[in-house]
UniProtKB/Swiss-Prot annotation:
This protein is one of the two subunits of integration host factor, a specific DNA-binding protein that functions in genetic recombination as well as in transcriptional and translational control. Keywords: DNA recombination, DNA-binding, Transcription, Transcription regulation, Translation regulation. One of its GO terms (molecular function) is DNA binding. Belongs to the bacterial histone-like protein family. It comes from Aeromonas salmonicida (strain A449). This is Integration host factor subunit beta. Coiled coil: none annotated. Signal peptide: none annotated. InterPro entries: Hist_DNA-bd, Histone-like_DNA-bd_CS, IHF-like_DNA-bd_dom_sf, IHF_beta. One of its GO terms (cellular component) is cytosol. Heterodimer of an alpha and a beta chain. GO terms for biological process: DNA recombination; regulation of DNA-templated transcription; regulation of translation.
Length: 94
């Protein structure tokens, strides 16, 4: 599902809200989440999961094209940990 798909589905299920308003709300939610992570804070949505930053230490990588070794600097990357309810909901055993 893409962001556009999400906006379309939410607008269809919320007849009283125009797609333009749904799109603005989704964009604002995502912007607030990005800003929170950028500030180094954690986001927790109960029943869904939490977003945080994980540090990746500097390391020596390899250029896949040439095979040359490349020094990679340390960096922070977003990390998502699903909540118990989400894990149980998607654990479909057939």
């Amino acid at each position: 599902m893409t962001k556009s798909d999400l906006i379309e589905q939410l607008a269809a299920s919320r007849m009283h809200m125009p797609a333009k308003d749904v799109e603005a709300a989704i964009k604002e939610i995502l912007e607030q989440m990005a800003s929170t992570l950028q500030n180094g804070d954690r986001i927790e949505i109960r029943g869904f999961g939490s977003f945080s930053l994980h540090y990746r230490a500097p390391r020596v990588g390899r250029n896949p094209k040439t095979g040359d070794k490349v020094e990679l600097t340390g960096k922070y990357v977003p990390h998502f940990k699903p909540g118990k309810e989400l894990r149980e909901r998607v654990n479909i055993i057939e």
